[in-house]
Regions:
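Hydrophobic/aromatic ligand-binding patch that stacks against planar heteroaromatic rings
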Residues: 7, 62-63, 89, 192, ...
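Conserved S/T- and glycine-rich ATP-binding loop of Class I adenylate-forming
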Residues: 2, 8-11, 44, 49, ...
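Structured core elements
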Residues: 4-7, 17-19, 45-46, 71-72, ...
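Conserved ATP-binding loop and adjacent catalytic segment of the adenylate-forming AMP-binding
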Residues: 71-73, 151-157, 169, 173-180, ...
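Alpha-helix/helix-capping structural signal
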Residues: 23, 103, 183-184
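Conserved AMP-binding/adenylation subdomain of ANL enzymes
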Residues: 26-45, 50-153, 157-164, 174
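Conserved AMP-binding A3 loop
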Residues: 3-29
Length: 224
């Protein structure tokens, strides 16, 4: 039976209505869970619009299938007020993972860097050095800590303890990863979030595929 008519984003042509069945959705949930494990204790906060199958499958249905918890952003009197509720809602919900798109990822990074700059030039320089060190250690993700870079592990661990952990606390302190979609996420952004301990696992999908086709995961990932 038909479940929804989902419209494509219109990236390459005019948006088109895609008829998706209940089995389309349940099959994609099963496929997604073969790549990323979701314990029943997990929580997520849906920030993305609720009118697309990305939020349906990865935000709602996989959580329902695993008996996990879902929250949505508190609606404000205006769209801008709703956006302003996101940071507070994240701290309240303490999500284990979040859905993201490139625009949202850029905004998160901008806010993090603004907060670091506000702490003064010493903290800013230290954060930049810690970030560069983590980049060298992590490489492309798949080859993290390989070869001589294993020697950097204690240094990266120290930076994580004194710097990156404090950044993660702004996301509730429980955030383990993002699932990214919607468009190609710049590899530099992927490296940034990986360095601070909140990997953004890039996925690829099509509305016609309900939508997940492939994705990086905690076990298999490569920043490209």
């Amino acid at each position: 039976d038909y479940a929804t008519i989902t419209y494509t984003s219109g990236t390459t042509a005019d948006p088109k209505g895609v008829v998706l069945t209940h089995r389309n959705y349940t099959a994609n949930v099963e496929q997604s869970l073969s790549r990323i494990d979701i314990p029943s204790s997990y929580r997520t906060l849906i920030i993305l619009p609720l009118d697309h199958c990305f939020a349906h499958v990865v935000g709602f249905y996989i959580m329902i299938a695993c008996g996990a918890s879902v929250a949505t952003v508190q609606i404000g009197a205006t769209p801008m007020e709703t956006l302003k509720n996101i940071p507070q809602n994240i701290r309240e919900v303490k999500p284990n993972f979040l859905l993201s798109v490139p625009a949202l990822a850029k905004n998160f990074r901008k806010n993090i860097e603004t907060s670091i700059r506000a702490k003064g030039p010493f903290t800013e320089r230290l954060f930049d050095f810690a970030l560069r060190t983590a980049y060298i250690y992590n490489q492309d993700g798949y080859h993290k800590g390989k070869g001589w870079r294993i020697l950097l592990a204690p240094v990266v661990g120290l930076f994580d303890l004194v710097l990156f952990r404090k950044v993660r606390e702004a996301f509730g302190g429980s955030l383990e990863f993002f699932v990214g979609g919607g468009a190609l996420l710049d590899s530099e952004l992927q490296r940034f979030f990986y360095a601070i301990g909140i990997p953004m696992f890039q996925g690829y999908g099509l509305s016609e595929a309900t939508p997940v086709i492939s994705t990086n995961s905690p076990k298999y990932h490569w920043h490209k």
